[in-house]
Amino acid sequence: MEQLKMQRLWLQSQNASGMVFDDTTRFSNLVMNYHLQDGNFHRPQEGAKESTIGVSSEGFMKLKKALVWGSFSFQQRNLSNAGYNASITDPFRGMPYYIIDEHQSDWRNQYYDLRFRASTPLMDNGLSFGVEGVYQASLSAKQRDPRVDTRFYTLKMVPSISYQVNEAHRLGLSLRYESIKEDSRMENENSDIDQNYYLLYGLGTAVQGIGSGRTTNYYGDRWGGALQYHFDSSVWNLFVEGSYDVRAENVEQSFTSPKKDAGVKDKTFQLSLTTYRKGNHYSQYLKTIYTNRHIDGIQYVSKYDNSESLDGWEVLHKSIRSTYNTNQASVHYTLMRNRGNEYNWKLETELAYSKQKDQYILPYSVKSSENILFHVGGKKNLIVGKKMNKRLLIDLHASYKKNLSGEYRYGGSHPEYISVTKLETSDANYLNSDWHRIGGSLTYSQMIKADAKTNFFVKASYDHVGTSDFNYNQRNQLSISAGCNF
């Protein structure tokens, strides 16, 4: 399954119509998993301890003449002692405008992810058409006052077309539309005690409030597109994809009397190149990715107009008050020793670079980080028994992240707020820490019956992340999963 997905270059892209050019072997799987991590080396909004239990399924098949792929996953994620978030499900999704409080709290989160792809067969004129749909939803609940019930939804549609120029060259085009919405409602279970909270406006700038919080409505859209080029010879496969999309999302206070508070304009450009070569004895895989993401943080000035013609909040002015820019580049190389439809062993290496610079324009504040990551790993696929196709896959890997530069400087008012002293300072310390990771996994698999195609597997993995920077120590991760491929 692992090697099959690596060879399907169009399935890795944003173009569903190109599935016709991939290996069209039918496959499906069902996986149940449990993941646990703890330790003090984490971002301030993450839990000191996090446990996740989930189930996922994926499948690909021919439905008459059409090609169809689909997947579904559900996760129940429990966070313990998470801080500095009292507003949204994911504080790392590129939305700087949310609410924090001074108490660490447990969270109970649920995530649903449903995806499908469909493609026509290759027509006589060399064209194929496809579509991808994605629906994601999450429900999150903070367990300590001020409590939060937040619900996030996104619906994405990606129509696509591809054209076979000749046996070796293919071109593709895909367009993307995505609708985004999140409803956040705060309240105090103990109404006798008011709680302090802070409305974030970027890099530590905040407005303090007291009481039970507020309701916040996040809504927006994302538009974009991608171009693909595929070269397929008898030996080499080369795949190039360039994509660009723009997300515009607004933040409104209150549902009964909406007040436009802030918004973002998020632009992302990505260019990737993938090559795959399968020889008689060895296979090679190389993937390079460059990503640039720029977010403009927009703030609104509004006044309440209770005239008969309006009776609501009127926007007087809006301006870009903060910017968030991230550049990332990575190169991943894999060498495999072939053994029939599987591999005997695999060696992997990766080099990744990232540079982030966030700025609040006036009064000026800045948070930046520049890092480089080295990764090496190896896998050995042992034949435990030829009968029932018994295998034991051993995986060992190690990573090292080196910080090249970084800082956090706050120039605004109220430097004593926890948004400055705790949230942004701790986050900058995490981003600018050196760390190392050592880990491995064992996967045992075998056929359920000698004459059946169903393959059962169980996997256990462990990773240790260590550091001594900024009074951090470690983060340990344990995962156990079981499932079947058929």
Please name every model-derived segment.
Residues 205-349:
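Long, internal scaffold/assembly segments composed of regular secondary structure
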Residues 63-66, 122-125, 164-168, 232-234, ...:
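Outer-membrane beta-barrel channels and translocator barrels
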Residues 40-46, 81-87, 141-148, 184-190, ...:
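Outer-membrane beta-barrel translocator domains and adjoining extracellular loop/strand segments
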Residues 32-38, 74-78, 122, 135-139, ...:
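Transmembrane beta-strands of outer-membrane beta-barrel pores
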